[in-house]
Swiss-Prot record:
There are two types of cytoskeletal and microfibrillar keratin: I (acidic; 40-55 kDa) and II (neutral to basic; 56-70 kDa). It comes from Mus musculus (Mouse). This keratin differs from all other IF proteins in lacking the C-terminal tail domain. Residues 83-118 are annotated as: Coil 1A. Residues 391-403 are annotated as: Rod-like helical tail. Residues 1-82 are annotated as: Head. This is Keratin, type I cytoskeletal 19. GO terms for biological process: cell differentiation involved in embryonic placenta development; Notch signaling pathway; response to estrogen; sarcomere organization. Coiled coil: none annotated.
Length: 403
């Protein structure tokens, strides 16, 4: 390696990285060093050059590590301090940019590998096949729909049973009121029957009294007739010669016939009245007895119907309680299953959202990295073109002799 030395100024520059291996470069000659002022990406670059002679040794590092070092022996009059610092800063920036590019490329590769692995793991496969979940969810939805329909039918049946029970209760209350009314009528008829019985007894007593009175009248009549006959017989014997006699037998016969006619008439009237009252009472008793029998039959039928309805109501209430318990158990079981499935779906959706957000973030980072890479490539190309142009220019210069 050739070495050139000058009196006063020397410079050291290095490109550092994070990679392993290095390339040693040795060169000598007179150079006009470029001084580059500009921003990232090579925009607004201005170049100035100064003649200098270098004695350098260096190494270019890879992505992970390494260094580029050089020793410059520069003429005091050929390279100013500002341009030397600018060149050193440019070398440092180039090295850091190269390190960043390679590190970002490697990180990008690792990220792509991770994304590919994640997609392979999260991709459709036997462990990530959600078709059976969809089928289970569809079956559960069908079962829930069926249970809802059955529940609606049961609720409708319960409402119908409740309406029927209310109807039967209304009928029972009506029939009960009718029964009470019939029983009240029966009690009234019994009182009427008792009154009629008392009236019949009274009439019988009146008839007996009339018969006794008639017998008494007959006896008195006979006694009066006997007394009159005895009186008339004495008068006839006394007055037989004075005046014509009165036909007392005829008078008595007429009186007797009149009394007999009156007694027979009274007897017939009393008997007719008694028979009419008895016939009327018998008719009323027969009618009321028939009504009582019909009412008793209706009450028996209603009691039997009420017992049947109460039994049916109890069975309907028992079936309602059993169906409500079954419905609550079914809703609880399917609610737990549905909540579990919803939790699984929510977990998958959260994972999918995280993956999408991660992919979006990685895309943004990748775009930023590609933008930085493109700008770095532009700066590297600009720097390389400048170095190649200056190197070609300096190679054409005469080589100074070593001192």
């Amino acid at each position: 390696m050739t070495s050139y030395s000058y009196r006063q100024t020397s410079a050291m520059s290095s490109f550092g990285g994070t990679g392993g291996g290095s390339v040693r470069i040795g060169s000598g000659g007179v150079f006009r060093a470029p001084s580059i002022h500009g921003g990232s990406g090579g925009r607004g670059v201005s170049v100035s050059s100064t003649r200098f002679v270098t004695s350098s040794s260096g190494s270019y590092g890879g992505v992970r590590g390494g260094s580029f070092s050089g020793t410059l022996a520069v003429s005091d009059g050929l390279l100013s301090g500002n341009e030397k610092i600018t060149m050193q800063n440019l070398n440092d920036r180039l090295a850091s940019y190269l390190d960043k590019v390679r590190a970002l490329e490697q990180a990008n590769g690792e990220l792509e590998v991770k994304i590919r692995d994640w997609y392979q793991k999260q991709g459709p496969g036997p462990s990530r096949d959600y078709n059976h979940y969809f089928k289970t969810i569809e079956d559960l939805r069908d079962k829930i729909l069926g249970a809802t329909i059955d529940n609606s039918k049961i609720v409708l049946q319960i409402d119908n049973a409740r309406l029927a029970a209310d109807d039967f209760r209304t009928k029972f209350e009506t029939e009960h009121a009718l029964r009470l009314s019939v029983e009240a009528d029966i009690n009234g008829l019994r009182r009427v029957l008792d009154e009629l019985t008392l009236a019949r007894t009274d009439l019988e007593m009146q008839i007996e009294s009339l018969k006794e009175e008639l017998a008494y009248l007959k006896k008195n009549h006979e006694e009066e007739i006997t007394a009159l006959r005895s009186q008339v017989g004495g008068q006839v014997s006394v007055e037989v010669d004075s005046t014509p006699g009165v036909d007392l037998a005829k008078i008595l016969s007429e009186m007797r016939s009149q009394y007999e006619i009156m007694a027979e008439k009274n007897r017939k009237d009393a008997e007719a009245t008694y028979l009419a009252r008895i016939e009327e009472l018998n008719t009323q008793v027969a009618v009321h007895s028939e009504q009582i029998q019909i009412s008793k039959t209706e009450v028996t039928d209603l009691r039997r119907t009420l017992q049947g309805l109460e039994i049916e109501l109890q069975s309907q209430l028992s079936m309602k309680a059993a169906l409500e318990g079954t419905l609550a158990e079914t809703e609880a079981r399917y609610g737990v299953q549905l909540s579990q499935i919803q939790s699984v779906i929510s977990g998958f959706e959260a994972q999918l959202s995280d993956v999408r957000a991660d992919i979006e973030r990685q895309n943004q980072e990748y775009k930023q990295l590609m933008d930085i890479k493109s700008r770095l490539e532009q700066e590297i190309a600009t720097y390389r073109s400048l170095l190649e142009g200056q190197e070609a220019h300096y190679n054409n210069l005469p080589t100074p002799k070593a001192i």
